[in-house]
Amino acid sequence: MSKDDSIKKTVTIGLSTTIFFVLSCFASIPVGFNVSIETSAAFLAFIAVAFGPSVGFYVGLIGHIIKDFFLFGNVSWNWVLCSALIGFIYGLPYKIIDLKYQVFTKKKIVYFWLYQVACNFIIWGFFAPQSDLLIYGQPPKLVYLQSFLIVISNILAYSVVGIKLMTIYSCHYTKQATLMKINNS
């Protein structure tokens, strides 16, 4: 990785973490049982797909730490790790989807929608509740209800906000890439 790339990634992580935190605090809709529909979940998916798994990991990690600290006064480390992990996993197909140089087609939208559904079920539907049961000994019914609501709310947030963000970003950059190719010919 060149020096310019590492600087760009660092700046992207810093700015995206700030946006993640602001969205977590001010753009979430409570649905009950300490669960909210968070636009920050859709933003994390967008950032990870646009910039790759390492950026997704750090935005999920740092953003969730700051959010927990400011909103709750303490950090739930198992959930922070789940946010970091899902940010990383969301970013794995970033070269396949390639928002910057290829159109975000319906096929890619469906592919990533199914992919993020599977990721949400694995991370928030399995790992997060299991870690709550093992670490905190919380009541299983409450833990699984929360995890089910989180999975559904993340899927809804991505379906409404994430797809729009990715489509707008892709349209903007693919037009620029096409213009650059035309100008260089």
Swiss-Prot record:
Organism: Aster yellows witches'-broom phytoplasma (strain AYWB)
Record membrane topology: Multi-pass membrane protein
Compartments reported by the entry: Cell membrane
UniProt family annotation: Belongs to the UPF0397 family.
Predominant subcellular localization, coarse grouping: membrane
Protein name: UPF0397 protein AYWB_013
Keyword ATP-binding on entry: no
GO cellular component entries: plasma membrane
PANTHER family: UPF0397 PROTEIN BC_2624-RELATED (PTHR37815), UPF0397 PROTEIN SPR0429 (PTHR37815:SF3)
Isomerase found in the keyword field: no
Membrane spanning stretches: 13-33, 42-62, 69-89, 109-129, 148-168
Residue ranges of coiled coil: none
UniProt entry keywords in alphabetical sequence: Cell membrane, Membrane, Transmembrane, Transmembrane helix
